[in-house]
Amino acid sequence: MDVVHDELRDDPTIDITTTGRRSGQARRIEIWMLDVDGRFFITGTPGRRDWLANLTDHPELVVHLKRHAHVDLPARAEVVSDPVTRRRVLDHLSARWYRGQAPVDELMARSPMVEITFPADAPG
């Protein structure tokens, strides 16, 4: 997914479209996606997030790259509960902003986090 790596190098801001957990309607939001050693993650500060509820019930989503590439990529999200992976993501340079928002122990325990994967036949 070179196009995704290239896009996130300068700016982690993307849009995602999820399917509403209750409504079934498409929901598009702006969010950050982190490139952590070639794997892609979306996280946030501690708290309830509609995007996480949507992805928990409907893990398929569309990642919209909008800075340079302007590409819509089908993807799948998986909730990250493994503490080793969570720590690796939160310790990564790309997650430094989050570490300034809450203590790392709180981020580890309560931050929403999903790993984003792309099908092998996705463009890029």
Where are the regions a protein language model picked out?
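Short beta-strand segments
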Residues: D11-T45, L61
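Generic signal for short, ordered secondary-structure residues
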Residues: D2-V3, L34, D72
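A generic structural micro-feature
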Residues: L8, S23-Q25, L55, M108
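Covalent nucleotidyltransferase core used to form phosphodiester bonds in nucleic acids
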Residues: V4-D6, F40-A53
